[in-house]
């Protein structure tokens, strides 16, 4: 296994951009206290990447929820391939969030039609179970369009799940907090107790259970 963790140098950035396509991967929900962690891998040709950049696609954290939803079908249409992987709350509690996040990323990559020779991963999390090359890029979602699009798809898909779960788990304001530990969410936990989708390992550390 080969990996590089780095602040991407300009010459490396240009080298990747000169390739015919790039495969980016990002996760969402790692810091949540409720629900699974999602990871998405996206394969983008150089041409599609340039088209999406011209449309204004950027790091999902810099976009409004409406913008992310607007970009979602465009990204799906222009990507050569994409795949979602996830790890359940049970896996997060049993394995720990680091291992569970890695597992969700591996699952996403394994669902791609063709195994990539190199992955561009947002942040420092190395995939120990991945045999190919990988580049771990700090703030990768603001530097590489494939990572940015993976971030958007993952965010839209997980947010959609959280909104659907609101009716099944009322009183926790999941549609609003998307499973993250807001003051309102913690207050609801004290009032209603835990559900089967709350991460006990996280809440234990916060002394909330």
From Swiss-Prot:
Its cofactor is Mn(2+); Mg(2+). It catalyses: Endonucleolytic cleavage to 5'-phosphomonoester. One of its GO terms (cellular component) is cytoplasm. This is Ribonuclease HII. One of its GO terms (biological process) is DNA replication, removal of RNA primer. The keyword Metal-binding applies. InterPro entries: RNase_HII, RNase_HII/HIII, RNase_HII/HIII_dom, RNaseH-like_sf, RNaseH_sf. It holds the Pfam family RNase_HII. Manganese or magnesium. Binds 1 divalent metal ion per monomer in the absence of substrate. May bind a second metal ion after substrate binding. Its EC number is 3.1.26.4. Belongs to the RNase HII family. Residues 20-209 form the RNase H type-2 domain. It comes from the Bacteria. Endonuclease that specifically degrades the RNA of RNA-DNA hybrids. It is found in: Cytoplasm. GO terms for molecular function: manganese ion binding; RNA binding; RNA-DNA hybrid ribonuclease activity. Keywords: Cytoplasm, Endonuclease, Hydrolase, Manganese, Metal-binding, Nuclease. HAMAP family: RNase_HII_B (MF_00052_B).
């Amino acid at each position: 296994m080969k990996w590089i963790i780095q602040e991407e140098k300009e010459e490396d950035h240009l080298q990747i951009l000169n390739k015919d396509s790039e495969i980016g991967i990002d996760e969402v929900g790692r810091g949540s206290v409720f629900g699974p962690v999602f990871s998405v891998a996206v394969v983008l040709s150089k041409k599609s990447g340039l088209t999406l950049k011209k449309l204004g696609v950027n790091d999902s954290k810099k976009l409004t929820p409406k913008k992310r939803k607007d970009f979602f079908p465009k990204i799906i249409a222009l990507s050569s391939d994409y795949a979602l992987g996830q790890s359940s709350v049970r896996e997060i509690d049993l394995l720990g969030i680091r291992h569970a996040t890695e597992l969700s990323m591996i699952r996403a990559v394994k669902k791609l039609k063709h195994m990539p020779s190199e992955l561009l991963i947002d942040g420092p999390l190395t995939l120990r179970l991945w045999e190919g090359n990988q580049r771990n890029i700090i703030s990768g979602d603001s530097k590489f369009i494939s990572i940015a699009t993976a971030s958007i798809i993952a965010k839209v898909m997980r947010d959609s799940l959280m909104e659907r779960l609101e009716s099944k788990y009322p009183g926790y304001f999941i549609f609003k907090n998307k499973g993250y530990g807001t003051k309102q969410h913690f207050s609801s936990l004290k009032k209603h107790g835990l559900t089967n989708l709350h991460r006990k390992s996280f809440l234990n550390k916060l002394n909330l259970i």
